[in-house]
């Protein structure tokens, strides 16, 4: 019979090893496994439980600005919806109106080829500050900012800045890494599926971080990772059904909407995905969601524009800046999940755990990151390979010969 006090002392001893500073992930993996085994024993024999709290921290609202004459326009690649990534930007649009008292508007469904015309449409409506709300616009935003110095542009996903252009990028690989641990701990079949859009921001980096997170619990080939690239709802359903048929019992989604989670929930499949509202996206079988929390950053940057103290930068934010967050872990998770995942979250947030620390091999076994080396954000963004552990890959995305374009109508309404 286990002794609660003795086990608790073991936990303290385990974690005290890390108090001296940074450690290697291989060492972390070993301790997470020790923690997992101990937790399992304690929870089974002593009926302990977690509290289900969220890992994220909240940001305070900015003060009102005196100058309310400026107008802010958003350019969206997709049509705005509660179900896709635009919803995370819409929160920032509301915050700008509430915190700064400014008027905002947007153009949605904009193709890359329409970016300049979309900006001009917003400019004609009086907008002097533009939020380029998709990474696919990064090059277009840079080009436009070079020739129009009368406006400020905040560009998502860009890698360069100008006197009137600031860019911001999220470390989405950080929550993906923790999510990998959640998936591994909640998988009984040791087969985990990924449904992703390969045109998403930092697609390989996010997927690789998720796989490396799995490997914090299981060794490289102790769990099969099977990937299907899909974009539309029909393709997503096909992908999920295929992965379920191959024995996967947890699905990780990296797409611009939450439909994969919704569909997984409808068939009783556990899922993890890009959402800030698990109760909306996957109320029954969703494990955890990850999302972008950039409203405060965007609002503060807009304030610098209207107060004439704009400072161009290339901003990269992660857990420590509360720029990316995790939702609370759901009741569908095993009870041990909270402690295991939050332990890893805390180390990543504090910079003690380096996600992409070598040696890292690609799916074919070729060393891509040498022992002791660590990739920086730009190197993660440039990853053109998948890490070792992937056992199946398929791409069912069909090219769209005549993609729809925007009518470039400037709108103000919010989605409910």
Where would I find each of the regions flagged by the language model?
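Intrinsically disordered, low-complexity segments enriched in serine/proline and basic residues
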Residues: 4-13, 17-18
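Bacterial N-terminal signal peptides that target proteins for export
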Residues: 24-35
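Hydrophobic helical h-region of N-terminal Sec-dependent signal peptides
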Residues: 37-41
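A residue-level marker of the well-folded mature domains of exported/periplasmic proteins
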Residues: 56-416
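Residue-identity detector for glycine
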Residues: 20-21, 56
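C-terminal motif of bacterial Sec signal peptides marking the signal peptidase cleavage site
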Residues: 45-47
């Amino acid at each position: 019979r286990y002794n609660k006090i003795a086990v608790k002392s073991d936990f303290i001893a385990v974690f005290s090893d890390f108090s001296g500073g940074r450690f290697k992930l291989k060492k972390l993996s070993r301790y997470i496994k020790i923690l997992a085994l101990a937790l399992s024993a304690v929870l089974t024999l002593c009926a302990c439980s977690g509290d289900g709290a969220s890992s994220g921290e909240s940001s305070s609202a900015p003060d009102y600005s005196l100058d309310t004459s400026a107008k802010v326009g958003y350019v969206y690649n997709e049509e705005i919806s509660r179900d896709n990534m635009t919803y995370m930007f819409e929160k920032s649009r509301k915050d700008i109106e509430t915190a700064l008292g400014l008027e905002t508007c947007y153009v949605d469904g904009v193709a890359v080829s329409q970016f300049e015309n979309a900006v001009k449409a917003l400019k004609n409506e009086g907008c002097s500050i533009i939020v380029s709300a998709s990474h696919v616009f990064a090059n277009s935003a840079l080009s436009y900012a070079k020739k129009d110095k009368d406006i400020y542009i905040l560009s998502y996903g860009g890698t360069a800045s100008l006197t009137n252009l600031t860019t911001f990028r999220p470390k989405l690989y950080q929550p993906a890494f923790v999510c990998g641990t959640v998936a591994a701990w909640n998988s009984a079949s040791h087969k985990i599926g990924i449904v992703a859009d390969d045109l998403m921001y930092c697609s390989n980096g996010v997927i690789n971080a998720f796989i490396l997170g799995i490997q914090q619990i299981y060794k490289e080939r102790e769990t099969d990772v099977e990937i299907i690239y899909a974009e539309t709802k029909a393709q997503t359903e096909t992908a999920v059904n295929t992965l379920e048929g191959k024995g996967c019992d947890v699905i990780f989604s990296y797409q611009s909407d939450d439909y994969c989670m919704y569909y997984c929930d409808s068939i009783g499949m556990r899922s993890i995905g890009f959402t800030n509202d698990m109760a909306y996206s996957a109320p029954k079988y969703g494990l955890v969601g990850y999302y972008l929390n950039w409203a405060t950053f965007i609002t503060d940057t807009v304030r610098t524009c209207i107060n004439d103290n704009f400072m161009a930068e290339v901003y990269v934010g992660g857990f420590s800046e509360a720029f990316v967050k995790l939702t609370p872990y759901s009741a569908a998770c095993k009870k041990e999940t909270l402690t295991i995942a939050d332990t890893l979250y805390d180390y990543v947030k504090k910079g003690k755990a380096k996600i992409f620390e070598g040696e890292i091999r690609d799916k074919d076994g070729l060393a891509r990151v040498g022992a002791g080396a660590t990739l920086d954000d730009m190197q993660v963004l440039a990853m053109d390979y998948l890490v070792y552990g992937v056992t199946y890959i398929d791409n069912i995305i069909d090219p769209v010969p005549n993609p729809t374009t925007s009518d470039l109508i400037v709108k103000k309404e919010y989605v409910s």
